Each structure stands twice: as C-alpha cells, then as structure tokens.
C-alpha cells in the first residue's frame, strides 16, 4: 500500500489544495487515517501564533488526527520571503524528518507541493528535487483552462524524466465558462499515461466544502493498493 504521495499542479493556482482536501476526505470516508503535509508554504501571514499559511490550515483541518501546525507545515515563508529574489536556505532535512514522522502515524500522507513541478524554492532549487530524493509517487492536478493540455503533457513528461511514477491526475474546473470541457478531458484521458482519479466542478469556497464525492474511490484505491510503483 502506498502510504504517501505528492500533489503537483500544471501551474500555480490550479487547485492543489482543494484537490488535496478532496483526496483526504475521500480516504477518510473509507476509514483511513490521513494527514495533509505542506513542507514549504509561501505567502504565509503573521498571526499571534506565528506565521500561518491558509493552504496548510486547510490540510490541518481535514487531517484525521490532531496535529500541531508545525507538523503540517514545517517551513512557512512570509510574503516578503516568498519571492525567489529573496535568497534563503531551505532545510530539506527538516521537511524529510517531518514527512517520516507523519508517515508513522497515519495510513496515508498527502503531500502538497508549492506551485508547479519546476517552481523554484528560495535556494533556486525546485522542490521536485526533494520529491525525487524521497521517491514519492506523484498525482497531478490539471486546472482545466486554455493551454492546460500542453501544460499537463509537459508536466507529465518532466515527472517521467525525473524517474518518478505519475499515479493519476485530477481535473479541476477552475474556469466555469470554458468551452469544450468534455473534449479537453477526453484528450487528456487519451494522452496522459495515468488514470483520471477525479473531477472537481467549479465551486465557490471549495476549500470549505465536502469534496470527497468528486474522487473516484475505486480508482484511488486501485492506484494506492500496490506496495511500490515503477515508472
């Protein structure tokens, strides 16, 4: 059984957090213990408790065990620190240890990335290098919009070039007015080398909703049932 997997997106703001929420809720509905993990979060806000990131808070809220914020998001970067122009080291040992600790506590850990597959951290390294180091299977979120077929195929190819398995993809309808939605899904289904795990419709305030119903549970169980996935 795959205990942990990584969520990437075809771009920034394509819905990685709401898809992560949907996956966590779907797995929890099957009696699984789950935890969300956001190793590096940009654009965090100062609060009385310290820096907090809204995406990480969503993941914390749908984890099935009580976790301190730092266990969900060990590295929170402020808005000023979030630009790649602001150079600072990233403690990869810290985020690896955090992932290992969560993996011991739950059935599944959903690890949400930052930006797209090649988005750079403040040390000018893509987080994907850490994903390769951890040998995490990858699930891709495709924001359904103009140009998404190109972005999805390029992202899938980059993941394969890095030697990691793409175990599935989820379509997120971020543009409700987009024509030819069904045709886009059909083309992606034919061209991507992994199964469609779910389709999220356009929903206002999706990060506050029950989203597990939009995940194809049988397909999700199938891709997670193996001990190890190869490319």
Swiss-Prot record:
The active-site annotation reads 38
Q: In which pathway does it act?
A: Cofactor biosynthesis; biotin biosynthesis; biotin from 7,8-diaminononanoate: step 1/2
Gene Ontology CC, one term:
cytosol
Q: Which SUPFAM superfamilies match?
A: P-loop containing nucleoside triphosphate hydrolases
Keyword annotations of the record: ATP-binding, Biotin biosynthesis, Cytoplasm, Ligase, Magnesium, Metal-binding, Nucleotide-binding
Record-linked InterPro entries: DTB_synth_BioD (IPR004472), P-loop_NTPase (IPR027417)
- What cofactor does its activity depend on? Mg(2+)
Q: What are the recorded Gene Ontology BP terms? A: biotin biosynthetic process
Q: Where does Mg(2+) bind?
A: 17, 55, 112
Q: What is its EC number?
A: 6.3.3.3
- Where does it localize? Cytoplasm
Write out the residues that bind ATP.
13-18, 55, 112-115, 172-173, 201-203, 208
Q: Where primarily located? A: cytoplasm
Spell out the reaction equation it catalyses: (7R,8S)-7,8-diammoniononanoate + CO2 + ATP = (4R,5S)-dethiobiotin + ADP + phosphate + 3 H(+)
What does the similarity note say?
Answer: Belongs to the dethiobiotin synthetase family.
Quaternary data: Homodimer.
Role according to the record: Catalyzes a mechanistically unusual reaction, the ATP-dependent insertion of CO2 between the N7 and N8 nitrogen atoms of 7,8-diaminopelargonic acid (DAPA, also called 7,8-diammoniononanoate) to form a ureido ring.
Recorded hits in PANTHER family, A to Z, give: ATP-DEPENDENT DETHIOBIOTIN SYNTHETASE BIOD 2, DETHIOBIOTIN SYNTHETASE
Q: What is this protein called?
A: ATP-dependent dethiobiotin synthetase BioD 2
Q: Which organism is it from?
A: Escherichia coli (strain K12)
Gene that encodes it: bioD2
């Amino acid at each position: 059984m795959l205990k942990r997997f990584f969520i990437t997106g075809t771009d920034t703001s394509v819905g990685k957090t709401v898809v992560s929420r949907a996956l966590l809720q779907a797995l929890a509905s099957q009696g699984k213990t789950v935890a969300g993990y956001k190793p590096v979060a940009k654009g965090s806000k100062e609060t009385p408790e310290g820096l907090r990131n809204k995406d990480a808070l969503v993941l914390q809220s749908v984890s099935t065990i009580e976790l301190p914020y730092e266990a969900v998001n060990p590295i929170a970067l402020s808005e000023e620190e979030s630009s790649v122009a602001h150079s600072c080291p990233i403690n990869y040992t810290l985020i690896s240890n955090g992932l290992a600790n969560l993996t011991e506590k739950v059935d599944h850990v959903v690890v949400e990335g930052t930006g797209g597959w090649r988005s750079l951290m403040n040390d000018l390294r893509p987080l994907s290098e850490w994903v390769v180091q951890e040998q995490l299977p990858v699930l891709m979120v495709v924001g359904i919009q103009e140009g998404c077929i190109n972005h999805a195929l390029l992202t899938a190819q980059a993941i394969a070039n890095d030697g990691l398995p793409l175990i599935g993809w989820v379509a997120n309808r971020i543009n409700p007015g987009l024509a030819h939605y069904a045709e886009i899904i059909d083309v992606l289904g034919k061209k991507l080398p992994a199964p469609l795990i779910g389709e999220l419709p356009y929903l206002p305030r999706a990060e506050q909703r029950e989203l597990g119903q939009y995940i194809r549970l049988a397909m999700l169980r199938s891709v997670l049932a193996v001990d190890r996935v190869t490319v």
